[in-house]
Amino acid sequence: MSSHDGLMVFTGNANPALAQEVVKILGIPLGKAMVSRFSDGEIQVEIQENVRGKDVFVLQSTCAPTNDNLMELMIMVDALKRASAGRITAAIPYFGYARQDRRPRSARVAISAKVVANMLEIAGVERIITMDLHADQIQGFFDIPVDNIYATPILLGDLRKQNYPDLLVVSPDVGGVVRARALAKQLNCDLAIIDKRRPKANVAEVMNIIGEVEGRTCVIMDDMVDTAGTLCKAAQVLKERGAKQVFAYATHPVLSGGAADRIAASALDELVVTDTIPLSAESLACPKIRALSSAGLLAETFSRIRRGDSVMSLFAES
């Protein structure tokens, strides 16, 4: 009996190309489901094959349009539950609303990441797979198992393949030091940190570089790139301090608000991302943006969960 017997993968409209890659690696067909809209825009999901007793994975990033993709995911999970699926795992490579994970200084704001966690559990999700959560503590918002996997093996593999000379890993802020230090250790290279601070109110933010960057090939490591404003400014500052080249590696290409044009016109030599979020036409047209596939990592994660094997051992050396 194959270890993939009983394993089924379904997807919504967020990233069907990634789902197709995953099932191709697993050697199984993509689950048959109709995901459409009623005339008033409401989402309709119909599961079009037998899932009774099956181990079902729903692959759906909650990227833009965030609310549509989130509702598709929850409605599909409910449809699968009512069709008697044996176990339902939501594979959410990019977990939307993750940046709203706390109340800063007791501001009157929602902790939206917790709201989303509650909604997914109520819908019937029994396990979560996500990749490079913006805040690790979001795992604690769930009362079900959460496998937060890392894109490090993908990004690290590309860095080793590129074999950049005089490599220096740069953390874009103090909060990213742990991630950047781990990468620097794997690459056996030095680490620099960008310390962003605002000297006083109504004064522009200043970037200070902690570390020697002159003559080095700098690699900025982050979990996501959104508008790319800070990233492009960091690349400019590094070049002004004498860096030969500046590359950026990030897991999630949110790339909103004209980010592709900003990157194209910046001092950044290249931005390397994964395909947890499909690239827009503007991003695909940008010669400085390159995407790596996360399908192999996701397929192996699905397979290990199906077999009952360790997932974290995938990252023992990352």
From Swiss-Prot:
Q: Give the UniProt keywords, A-Z.
A: ATP-binding, Cytoplasm, Kinase, Magnesium, Metal-binding, Nucleotide biosynthesis, Nucleotide-binding, Transferase
Q: Name one GO molecular function term.
A: magnesium ion binding
Tell me which GO cellular component terms the UniProt record holds.
Answer: cytoplasm; ribose phosphate diphosphokinase complex
| The EC number(s) this enzyme carries | 2.7.6.1
Q: What Gene Ontology biological process does one annotation of this record name? A: purine nucleotide biosynthetic process
So where's the catalytic machinery, residue-wise? K196
Chain sites annotated for binding ATP: D40, G41, E42, R99, Q100
UniProt-annotated binding residues for Mg(2+) 2: D173
Which SUPFAM superfamilies does this one have? PRTase-like
Q: Which reaction does it catalyse?
A: D-ribose 5-phosphate + ATP = 5-phospho-alpha-D-ribose 1-diphosphate + AMP + H(+)
Name the positions where Mg(2+) 1 binds. Answer: H134
Q: Does the keyword ATP-binding apply?
A: yes
InterPro entries the record matches: PRib_PP_synth_CS, Pribosyltran_N, PRibTrfase_dom, PRTase-like, Rib-P_diPkinase, Rib-P_diPkinase_bac
Q: Which domain of life is it from?
A: Bacteria
Q: So where does D-ribose 5-phosphate get bound? A: R198, D222, D226, T227, A228, G229, T230
Location of this chain's protein in the cell: Cytoplasm
Keyword rRNA-binding listed? The answer is no
In what pathway does it function? Metabolic intermediate biosynthesis; 5-phospho-alpha-D-ribose 1-diphosphate biosynthesis; 5-phospho-alpha-D-ribose 1-diphosphate from D-ribose 5-phosphate (route I): step 1/1
Query: What's this protein's family per the entry?
Result: Belongs to the ribose-phosphate pyrophosphokinase family. Class I subfamily.
Role according to the record: Involved in the biosynthesis of the central metabolite phospho-alpha-D-ribosyl-1-pyrophosphate (PRPP) via the transfer of pyrophosphoryl group from ATP to 1-hydroxyl of ribose-5-phosphate (Rib-5-P).
* Subunit structure, as described in the record: Homohexamer.
Protein name, per record: Ribose-phosphate pyrophosphokinase
Species source reads Burkholderia pseudomallei (strain K96243)
Q: Which gene encodes it?
A: prs
